[in-house]
Curated annotation (Swiss-Prot):
<dbReference type="Pfam" id="PF01966">
    <property type="entry name" value="HD"/>
</dbReference>
<dbReference type="InterPro" id="IPR006674">
    <property type="entry name" value="HD_domain"/>
</dbReference>
<dbReference type="InterPro" id="IPR004088">
    <property type="entry name" value="KH_dom_type_1"/>
</dbReference>
<comment type="function">
    <text>Endoribonuclease that initiates mRNA decay.</text>
</comment>
<keyword id="KW-1133">Transmembrane helix</keyword>
<protein>
    <recommendedName>
        <fullName>Ribonuclease Y</fullName>
        <ecNumber>3.1.-.-</ecNumber>
    </recommendedName>
</protein>
<dbReference type="GO" id="GO:0006402">
    <property type="term" value="P:mRNA catabolic process"/>
</dbReference>
<keyword id="KW-0812">Transmembrane</keyword>
<dbReference type="InterPro" id="IPR036612">
    <property type="entry name" value="KH_dom_type_1_sf"/>
</dbReference>
<feature type="domain" description="HD">
    <location>
        <begin position="327"/>
        <end position="420"/>
    </location>
</feature>
<dbReference type="GO" id="GO:0003723">
    <property type="term" value="F:RNA binding"/>
</dbReference>
<dbReference type="InterPro" id="IPR006675">
    <property type="entry name" value="HDIG_dom"/>
</dbReference>
<dbReference type="InterPro" id="IPR004087">
    <property type="entry name" value="KH_dom"/>
</dbReference>
<dbReference type="Pfam" id="PF12072">
    <property type="entry name" value="RNase_Y_N"/>
</dbReference>
<keyword id="KW-0540">Nuclease</keyword>
<dbReference type="InterPro" id="IPR017705">
    <property type="entry name" value="Ribonuclease_Y"/>
</dbReference>
<keyword id="KW-0694">RNA-binding</keyword>
Length: 511
C-alpha cells in the first residue's frame, strides 16, 4: 500500500515536471514571438516616423516657398502703389505750379482793373459834383430841398398805394365774409324744412243742417249771448248754408269757442247751463293742448329742462300769429336755423337752439305785460332761471338791448331768415302794392334821384342818383334820411335795405 502511494507520488511528480517543462517552453516561445512582433512593430514605427518626417519637411518647405512668394508679390504691389502715389504727387505739384502762375496773372489783372475803377470813381465823383452844382443852379434848389421834395413825393405814392391795398383787402375780406355767411345760411335753410299754417281771425264751424242755427241762437238769442259772453267770441250766423262763423282776434278764445260749439252740436242739448259746462270743458282741453304743444316743441328741437311755465308759454304760441305766420312754428324753425348755423361756426349748438326756441315767448303772455315782446321774453326767461346767455339772446333779438354772445347774433339772424322766407308771412295784395309804391315815392322825393326800384318783395329799394348832383357824402346822407323817413311813415315786416347807387362813367375812344 505504501509502495502504491509512492508510485503515485512519483507519477504525479513526473507528470508535474513534464507539465512545467512544457509550460516553460511554451512561455519561452511566446516571449520570443512577442519579441519578434515588437521588433517588427518598432521597425514599422521607425519607417512610418521617417516617412512622416519627410512629409512634414516637404510641407514646411512648400509653406515657406508659398509665404516667400506671397511676400514678394505684396512687396511688388506696395512698390507699384508707391510709384503711383509718387506720379500723382508729381502731377499735382505741376498743377499747383500752373495754378499759382494763373493766380499771379489774375492778381496782376485785378490790380490793374482796381486802379482803373478807382480812376473811374474819381471821375464819376467829379462829374457828379459838377452836375449837382449845375442842377442846383438851374433849379434854384439846394440838395436838401430836392431831397425833401423827393421824399414827400415818395410818401404820397406809398400812402396812395397803401390806401388802395387796404381798400382791396377790405373788399376781398367783405366778399369772402359775405360768401361764407351766405354759404352757412344756405346750408342751414336747406337742412331745415318747417311748415307754417297761416291763421286768420275767423273760424268756420260746420253744422249738420240749417235747423241747428236756430237752436244755437236759442229763445230770444239767450244761447248765442251766453256763448259769446263766456268765450268773448263773436258768433256770426248769416246765410252761409250749414255753417257758423266764429270771429275773434284772440286765437285761444276762438279755439275755446270752436271746441265748445262742436261739443254742443254733437251733444244736441243747447241751453245756457249746458253751454257753460261745455265751455269749461273746452277751456281744459285747450289748456291740455297748450301743454302738449309746448312739450312737443321741446321734443322736436331737443331742448330739455325747461320750467313748466315756460312750456305753457311755448304752447300758447300755437295760438299766436305774426303777419299770418304761426309763432310756435316760427320759433321751432328759428331754433333749427340757429342750431345749424352754430354747428357750422363751431359755437354752442344747444345754447343757440334753446335761445331760438324761446326768443318769442314774450308773445305768449296776455295784456297784463307792457313793453316790447323781446324785453318781456327776457324778463320771463330770467324769472324762470334761464342762463344769462339765453336771457340776453331773447331780449336782444330785436335790438332792444346789446348782444353779448355770438349765439344771440345767430338767433337774430335766424329770426330774420324765418320771417323773410317767401310765404312765411303774408299781407293783403292791396297793402303790399301800396307799400311798394310808398317806398318808391319816398325815395324819389329827394332831389338828385334819377330812378328808384323796390325789389325783393319790398325788402330792398335801389335808388339811382345823378352823379353831378349828389356826391359820395351826399349819397350816404340820403340813405340815412330815407331810412328815417321809411321808419316814420311805413309799417312793414322784417327790415328794408336802402341801396343808394352813384355811378360815374368816363368814355373815350382810341383812334
Amino acid at each position: 500500500m505504501v509502495v502504491g502511494i509512492l508510485i503515485g507520488i512519483i507519477i504525479l511528480g513526473v507528470v508535474g515536471f513534464i507539465q512545467y517543462t512544457l509550460i516553460e517552453k511554451a512561455s519561452k516561445n511566446r516571449v520570443e514571438s512577442l519579441e519578434k512582433e515588437a521588433s517588427l512593430a518598432l521597425e514599422e514605427a521607425k519607417r512610418e516616423a521617417e516617412s512622416t518626417k519627410k512629409e512634414a519637411i516637404l510641407e514646411a518647405k512648400e509653406e515657406v516657398h508659398k509665404l516667400r512668394s506671397d511676400l514678394d508679390k505684396e512687396i511688388r504691389d506696395r512698390r507699384n502703389e508707391i510709384q503711383r502715389f509718387e506720379r500723382r504727387l508729381i502731377q499735382r505739384e505741376e498743377s499747383l505750379d500752373k495754378k499759382g502762375e494763373m493766380l499771379e496773372k489774375r492778381e496782376d489783372s485785378i490790380n490793374k482793373k482796381s486802379i482803373e475803377i478807382q480812376e473811374l470813381e474819381e471821375r464819376v465823383q467829379s462829374l457828379y459834383g459838377e452836375q449837382r452844382a449845375e442842377l442846383e443852379r438851374i433849379s434854384n434848389l439846394s440838395s436838401e430841398d430836392a431831397r425833401t421834395l423827393l421824399l414827400d413825393e415818395v410818401r404820397r405814392e406809398i400812402k396812395h398805394e397803401s390806401a388802395m391795398l387796404i381798400k382791396e383787402l377790405e373788399t376781398k375780406a367783405k366778399e369772402e365774409a359775405d360768401k361764407k355767411s351766405r354759404e352757412i345760411i344756405t346750408n342751414a335753410i336747406q337742412r331745415c324744412a318747417a311748415d307754417h299754417v297761416s291763421e286768420t281771425t275767423v273760424h268756420v264751424v260746420a253744422l249738420p243742417n240749417d235747423e241747428m242755427k236756430g237752436r244755437i241762437i236759442g229763445r230770444e238769442g239767450r244761447n248765442i249771448r251766453t256763448l259769446e259772453t263766456l268765450t268773448g267770441v263773436d258768433l256770426i250766423i248769416d246765410d252761409t248754408p250749414e255753417a257758423v262763423i266764429l270771429s275773434s282776434f284772440d286765437p285761444i278764445r276762438r279755439e275755446v269757442a270752436r271746441i265748445a260749439l262742436e261739443k254742443l252740436i254733437v251733444d244736441g242739448r243747447i241751453h245756457p247751463a249746458r253751454i257753460e259746462e261745455m265751455v269749461e270743458r273746452a277751456i281744459k282741453d285747450v289748456e291740455n293742448d297748450i301743454k302738449e304743444e309746448g312739450e312737443q316743441a321741446t321734443f322736436e328741437t331737443g331742448v330739455h329742462g325747461l320750467h313748466p311755465e315756460i312750456i305753457k308759454l311755448l304752447g300758447r304760441l300755437k295760438y299766436r300769429t305774426s303777419y299770418g305766420q304761426n309763432v310756435l312754428k316760427h320759433s321751432i324753425e328759428v331754433s333749427y336755423l340757429a342750431g345749424l348755423m352754430a354747428s357750422e361756426l363751431g359755437l354752442d349748438v344747444n345754447l343757440a337752439r334753446r335761445a331760438g326756441l324761446l326768443h318769442d315767448i314774450g308773445k305768449g303772455v296776455d295784456q297784463e305785460y307792457e313793453g316790447p315782446h323781446a324785453v318781456i321774453g327776457g324778463e320771463l326767461a330770467k324769472k324762470y332761471h334761464e342762463s344769462p346767455a339765453v336771457v340776453n339772446a331773447i331780449a336782444a333779438h330785436h335790438g332792444d338791448t346789446e348782444m353779448q354772445t355770438l349765439e344771440a347774433v345767430l338767433v337774430q339772424a335766424a329770426d330774420a331768415i324765418s320771417a323773410a322766407r317767401p310765404g312765411a308771412r303774408r299781407e293783403t295784395l292791396e297793402a303790399y302794392i301800396k307799400r311798394l309804391e310808398k317806398l318808391e315815392e319816398i325815395a324819389t322825393s329827394y332831389e338828385g334821384v334819377e330812378k328808384s326800384y323796390a325789389i325783393q318783395a319790398g325788402r330792398e329799394i335801389r335808388i339811382m342818383v345823378k352823379p353831378d348832383q349828389v356826391d359820395d357824402a351826399g349819397a350816404i346822407e340820403m340813405a340815412r334820411n330815407i331810412v328815417k323817413k321809411i321808419e316814420e311813415q311805413l309799417e312793414y315786416p322784417g327790415q328794408i335795405k336802402i341801396n343808394v347807387i352813384r355811378e360815374t362813367r368816363a368814355v373815350d375812344y382810341a383812334k
